[in-house]
């Protein structure tokens, strides 16, 4: 596509987007990727005034887009009064230096832009630590020769002197800070592991919402839990994990968690830093993969989510695909989607359409890992009374017969909970699992 200009309002950073395609057949994909980059730039508070898509067999080691294209890009940026040039790929430290010299303006890449958005969105201490760790790990190998704006990380100009001496100081301070932040995150991981262990002892199943950013996960979370978490038509609104209790129609309880949205080429440093959060997905009993049913790049987005799930060790978690925003589809588009993926759920979290059917599907999927048991309780025993109440929370009770101070309950119980159902009062004859 040709380079194009749009008008921008004042008092915002004016951005140029630059992409590269290695062949004519991939131009459409590269253009879609630039569209996504424009959304990221908007989320970061910039306004896009210039788009450039360069075609060449492979990236140039020095300037990524080639010397001639860098020269023409510099002229276009000057004409459009560009403040920041954003590349749709991760640039090497050498390419960043060359481009800043050639373009004479700030240059960042896709990774740095995503990190900036995460930094803006983080609200809790945990979220801020995770973003900071990712930013510092990204910055560390890019310090040599960067030469600008490092004083705010190194304690101010003059702490050690100019040039390489100051950069070495920055590097040492950053390594020290990385270690400190990592310790805080390790503490968070340990605390989360303890909380998961407690939940597992209660045997309340956990369902995690995962999906591409802006697929509607938080809107679905609000619909399922009757909460009012912030949901917006914007990227990466949810960074800090949310966990709420939900009661199924058969009276069983489950926990629903909302997680950070994924994106294609999610920076590895960010995935690593958010591992404490994403481990919640790896430990879930079921993952609901929320998909924007009307997204032009739907298949690519689905593949990106699956890659991140593999990276965080969640590839073995059962997944139910949930196509959201079906209110934006035509009847024919709905039918084609149902024919293509008959095992999936089709819903509209915004309107509430088919939410009840989704809840039934979740209950059914969770029931696959249950076993029918019959167990007798002594109603005079405090421990047994507590077990009865817990059984109603975690299992689907089929029958309840009471008499002579005893209660006999037949229920479909999660397999991992059965071993804990033998009561002290009735160690042998009290349970019949079949």
Residue ranges with predicted function:
Residues 1-115, 430-434:
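N-terminal accessory targeting/assembly segments
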Residues 2-3, 190-192, 196-205, 223-255, ...:
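Switch I (effector-binding) loop of TRAFAC-class P-loop GTPase G-domains
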Residues 112-131:
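Short alpha-helix plus adjacent loop in nuclease-associated cores
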Residues 111-115, 235-236, 349-351:
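Short, acidic/turn-prone active-site loops that include or flank metal/cofactor-
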Residues 24-29, 58-63, 121-126, 165-166, ...:
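Flexible beta-alpha connector loops of hexameric P-loop NTPases
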Residues 26, 33-43, 47, 70, ...:
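Conserved C-terminal guanine-recognition region of P-loop GTPase G domains, centered on the G4
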Residues 1-18, 22, 29, 38, ...:
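C-terminal-of-GTPase-core extension/linker across diverse P-loop GTPases
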């Amino acid at each position: 596509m040709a380079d194009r200009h749009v008008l921008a309002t004042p008092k915002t950073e004016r951005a140029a987007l630059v992409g590269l395609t290695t062949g004519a057949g991939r131009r459409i994909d590269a253009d879609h990727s630039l569209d996504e980059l424009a959304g990221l730039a908007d989320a970061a508070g910039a306004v896009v005034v210039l788009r450039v898509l360069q075609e060449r067999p492979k990236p140039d080691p020095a300037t990524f887009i080639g010397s001639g294209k860098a020269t023409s890009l510099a002229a276009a940026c000057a004409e459009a009064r560009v403040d920041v040039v954003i590349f749709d790929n991760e640039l090497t430290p050498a390419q960043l230096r060359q481009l800043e010299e050639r373009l004479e303006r700030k240059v960042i890449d896709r990774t740095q832009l995503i990190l900036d958005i995460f930094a803006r969105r983080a609200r809790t201490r945990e979220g801020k630590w995770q973003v900071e760790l990712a930013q510092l790990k990204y910055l560390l190998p890019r310090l040599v020769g960067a030469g600008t704006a490092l004083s705010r990380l190194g304690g101010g100009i003059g702490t050690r002197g100019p040039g390489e001496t100051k950069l070495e100081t920055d590097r040492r301070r950053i390594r020290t800070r990385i270690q400190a932040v990592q310790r805080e995150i390790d503490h968070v991981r340990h605390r989360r592991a303890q909380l998961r262990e407690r939940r597992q002892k209660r045997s309340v199943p956990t369902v995690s919402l995962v999906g591409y950013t802006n697929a509607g996960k938080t809107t679905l979370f609000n619909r399922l839990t009757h909460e009012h978490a912030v949901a917006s038509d914007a990227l990466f609104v949810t960074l800090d994990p949310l966990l709420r209790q939900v009661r199924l129609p058969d009276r069983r309880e489950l926990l629903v968690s909302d997680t950070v949205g994924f994106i294609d080429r999610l920076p590895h440093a960010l995935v690593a830093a958010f591992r404490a959060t994403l481990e919640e997905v790896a430990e879930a009993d079921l993952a609901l993969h929320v998909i924007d049913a009307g997204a032009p790049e739907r298949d690519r987005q689905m593949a990106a989510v699956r890659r991140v799930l593999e990276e965080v060790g969640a590839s073995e978690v059962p997944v139910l695909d949930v196509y959201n925003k079906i209110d934006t589809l035509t009847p024919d588009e709905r039918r084609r989607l149902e024919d293509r993926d008959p095992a999936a759920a089709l819903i509209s979290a915004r309107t509430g359409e088919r939410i009840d059917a989704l809840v039934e599907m979740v209950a059914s999927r969770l029931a696959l890992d249950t076993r029918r048991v019959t167990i007798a309780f002594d109603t005079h025993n405090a421990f047994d009374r507590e077990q009865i109440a817990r059984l109603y929370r975690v299992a689907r009770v089929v029958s309840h017969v009471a008499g002579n101070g005893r209660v006999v309950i037949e229920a479909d119980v999660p397999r991992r909970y059965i071993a804990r159902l033998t009561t002290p009062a009735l160690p042998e004859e009290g349970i019949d699992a079949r």
